[in-house]
Structures are given as structure tokens and as C-alpha cells.
């Protein structure tokens, strides 16, 4: 019975449970997804999916989650971190964060971060603690510490809580700096104590380094402190100058000026004053100064000492040593600058004085000093007339002036160019500058100086037409250099004695330089006067000089002719041509130029070729023309025909030929040999040394002199070969071959070239010894 009752109770409970329980229909995951998708398509539902797409959440719930994260992070949440934590796309987080910041004024969105007021209050408390510890803080420091924008920190944090949570004040000159009043008082105390201890100018940077105060605070508090001194500027190199030091400076400057009447800039600069001139003007506003490069001279020193002494010097016609009346520590440059400044201010007449190395000469003193030099200038002018120097200067000057007026026409220039080119081709075919020797060898050497005197001493071996044309062109473009009859040494020697008595001998040359041009012009004027007074005398002297030079050249040709006649055949012919093209050409030039001067013709150049002489001769008077033309033609003939033609020209010029003097001939030969020996001793070039040695041996062996260029060396050696012994011939031949090798070398620095030069150097002494010491019994007896 009891069991039945229990069964009834159980069934009743089950029935009641069935009545109370609602019917639920479970859906599968796929069905749920389809239902949500359908709701989203119909925009009946707004959800946010997670990054993995497995979960979704409503925006309202996501917003609550973001605020929870902000609270959990202490009031400052990075949206990137929130996105990672909630597993939601960052863009959805940023949109909701913007909405949160817009709806709630207590929350700020800043650089991808949400910040609430509680966090800002916390920051303000930290800033206040830091400001209390340091006394001064800047927004830039806070920016780096809290990683927040400077404007946000300044306006939303510091300025908002300044005077409340943050106990301090803002710098008026720099609103981004904040400090406490206690800090300002400490800085004032440091600055006041440091400046009170300074007794000399000190850099502000050094002061700030010692007291650990910032420069901007130093300058802002300086006026409030009112120190016993001043700061020169607010720049980096500013200095603090205490008043006691400035007073010491002023006392020293006043004392020095009172005692010396001048001030040195260097001395003032050493006192720590950078602009000395401005300081002097400020310190002495009522004084007048003469400001020089290194010193400033007071008006009292200028007026009472310098100007007064200069006036006395001018009145007594003496000289004045400025170094004795000016301060001793002034340099010579300072003294000269002071003198020029005094002259510029017209305290004295500048034309009455001459300044030389701190000595001021009155013009009257110098005039008296150089008075004897005027007599010397007249004497030198007479000497220049007597020896023909001035006459030659007048001729060259006249020719240059005429050439400058007439040279330059195109027709004449073309004609001269054609003549020069034809003559150059003719010279290349016949002169000793090119061609081969008797053995097919060519020795390119410099021409030996020949025995001649006067104007014939030109370099005949290089009768180059380009030089002649260039010389002519230069003479037409440039005026003749002014003749200097009086030299500076002449004046110096004459006035040195007088100056030496005064201890001023070191100024003799500078004084001479002042009067050199004046005395030279005086001498030239006197020479012109004498020249105009005796023209006939000058003409006779020129006539005699030309006659002497031509006779000397004719004697040389006759002596050289004896030597070249010892050669046979083609060698003799070439030597004759070379002799006439050199010495013969000089004779033609001498006589042609003389005749041109007699006929008052303009000559472009004194070194003429055949065509130029022919052109010039055509303009000469008839009495000279034929003789000069025949003489020019004879240059291409024999020596005898040239001498006959020259005699005809001399006769037309009223000149005579001197008789042959065999005793004098012997002296000329000996003198010629001595000159060759002297050149040999001075010679270092192998080719020229061989050339000289050959000519000396030829003269020693034959007793005759020879006029030959380097191309004839092999012929000369062949001619004297029979007279020399075998070792001597071998020595000369070996040296000759080595010279040819040197001349044919294309690379002077090669090993072969160096070897040849070493061999030549080794044989040089033997060749010179042979040329100097060789003798024959017959020759020695004749000498």
C-alpha cells in the first residue's frame, strides 16, 4: 500500500514538472549562422566580428569593453593594445574611441591613445613632485618623459593645474618653462654671491658654469639683482665687468694719457677693452685725437711738439728726427703715419718737407745737399757727347719714331715677309747651320766666338730672319729706352760724405733716388745742347768709328782666308761662303747703315739681310747705290771680289783701307788663340768643347786662324790628322763619335745616353789637355 502511494507521488511530481517546463527547440550551429546572416542582410542586427571571425559582439558591448580596458590600464589605453586584447579590428576600435571621446568630455583621444581625467590628475601630481625636487622644469623635458604632445601637456595638464595641483609659476619670457619661487630665490642668491666676488672681467659662461644657473635665467634676474657691474652683451662671448675694474681701467688710461699725451690700442686692449677707439672717444669727449693704426695722439702732442718742430725745421733749412720728439715706443710705421696725417691736416706746407725713415728733411736742405750733383750732371753730359753715347741714343730714338709712324702698312709687311722667306730658304741651302761634313757626319754645335771688335760682335752663325723681323717689329712698337746719363751710385757717392757727418749715411741712396730723374733730365738737356752745338764734330766721329770697324773686319777676313785656303775642294768653297755670310754680311750692314744715315733714311733693323739691304740701297743717293749693290752681289762670289767691291764702297764713303801690318797680324793670331783657350776652359758642353779643341789644334799646327761652324769639325780633324800621332787621333775620333751619339739621342734619360755622357766626361780632360799643351817644333819656334 505504501509503495503504491509512493508511485502516485512520483507521478504527480513528474506531471507538475511537465506543466511548469516550457518547450524548447534546440538549433544547430549552421542554423544559428544562417539566422544571424539573414538578420544582418536585412539590417535588423548590428554586430562586430572578431579578427578570426568566430565570434561577434554588438557595438554597445564593445564600447563597454573599451571603457573597461581604459579603466584597467589606469586611465591611459593604447588603441593598438586594446585591439589586440579584444581581438577586434583596429579601425572599429578607433571609431568607437572617437565616439567615446566625443560623448565624454572627461576622456581625451590623443595620438592613438585614450586618456581620462584621472590619469591627467596623476600626471599633474608627478609633475608637481618633479618641480619641487628640481625647482625648474620645461615642457620639452615632460614631453620626453610622458610621451605626450607638448601642447597637450602645456595646456591640458600644466597650465590647467598650475596653482592647484602644481605649485609653481610660469616664466614670462618663456611660457614653456615653469619654476618654483624657491628656485628663483636660490638662483638670485647664487648670482648675487658670484658677481660680488668677481674683481676682473669674466666670461658669463664661466660664471654660469660655476654656479650652475641657466643663461636665460641669469639675464632675466640680472636687472632685479642690480649688481655692481655690467654685462657687455647677451651673446655667447659676453663678459661681466665689475664697476671697480672699470674704474681701475679709467684711472690707468687717464694717468697714461696725462703723462704721455698718446694712447696705444694694444695697451687698452690688454685691459679687456675690445674697441679702443670708441673707448678713447667716450673717456675723453672734450679732447681731440689723431687716430692712427696703432696709437692715438693727443692734440697737445701734435700742436706743441710735432707742428712746432716742423716749422722750426723749415725756418732753419735743416732736418728733423721725429723719433727724438715723439714717444720712444712708437715704431717707424707709426711715425710715418703721424707725419702723413699732420701733412694731410695742413698744419704745415707738405711741399716744404721730405720724409725718409723717420727723418724729415726741409726742401731747402736737400736742395743745398744735391747742389754739387748738378755740376756732375753737366760733366756726364759732356762725356756722353765725347764718346758718342748720346749720338747713338738720338739715332736709335729717331729711327724708332720713324718706324712707328711708317711701319705697319700691309703692303710693306707682305713684301718683307716674302723677302725674309726667300732669304731663309737660301740660307738653309748655303749656310753652315745645315748640311753634312766631308765624312757625311753633322756636328750640331754652337758657333765659336770669332776675333772681332765693335758692332761686328754679333752671333753670325744664327743669322735668323725671324729675329730680324721680330726686332724690327718690336722697334716700331716700343720707344727707345730713355738714356740714363746719371746713375744713382754717382749721386750717392757725392752726397754720402755730407750725410755721414750727420750720421745719416744710410739715407744717401733714398735721397739719391729722389733726385735721380731730375738730375738725369738735366744731363740729357745739357747733352742735347752740346749735340746741337757741334753736329759736324759728331759726324766726323761716326765716320771714323765706322771706318775703324770696317778695317778691323777686313783684317779678320784676310786672316781667316789664309786658314781656309789650306783646305781643298768643296770644303774650302763652303768655308768661303760661311765667312762671307757672316763677317762679309757685317761689313755690308755697317756700310749700308752708315750710308742710310747719311741719306736720312729710316731703317727698321740694324741686322739686315741681302734683300733688305737691296731695298734700302735703292733709296740711297746715286753716288752710293751702284757700289753698295755690287758689294751685296759679291757676297755670293769669291773673297777677292768681295774685297774689291768693299774698297769701292769705302771710296764712295770717303774712307780709306789701312795697309797690311804682318807684325800686328801675328799678334791678332796669338790673341785669337788665347780667346779660344779661355773659352775652352769655361766650356762644359761636349760638342762645343770638341769644336774649340779642333780650332785650337788647327791654329797651333798651321799658324793660321779659321772661321768655321760646328759642321766643319770633322773636316778640321781630317786635315790635322797627319800631324797628330795615333793615340791623339784615336782620342779625337772617339770623342767625336761620342758627341755624334749624344746629338742623335732621342731620350736623354736612357741608360745608353747616360753611359755615353759618362764616357765623354772621362775623355773631356784628355781632350782639353791635348788642345792646351800640343805643340810642334816649327810652330813653337815661329811663335
Swiss-Prot record:
Residues 446-457 have a biased composition (Basic residues). Belongs to the UFL1 family. One of its GO terms (biological process) is regulation of proteasomal ubiquitin-dependent protein catabolic process. One of its GO terms (molecular function) is UFM1 ligase activity. E3 UFM1-protein ligase that mediates ufmylation of target proteins. Its EC number is 2.3.2.-. Residues 406-476 are annotated as: Disordered. The keyword Glycoprotein does not apply. This is E3 UFM1-protein ligase 1 homolog. It comes from Drosophila grimshawi. InterPro entries: Ufl1, Ufl1-like_C, Ufl1_dom, Ufl1_N. Pfam families: E3_UFM1_ligase, UFL1, UFL1_C. One of its GO terms (cellular component) is endoplasmic reticulum membrane. Keywords: Transferase, Ubl conjugation pathway.
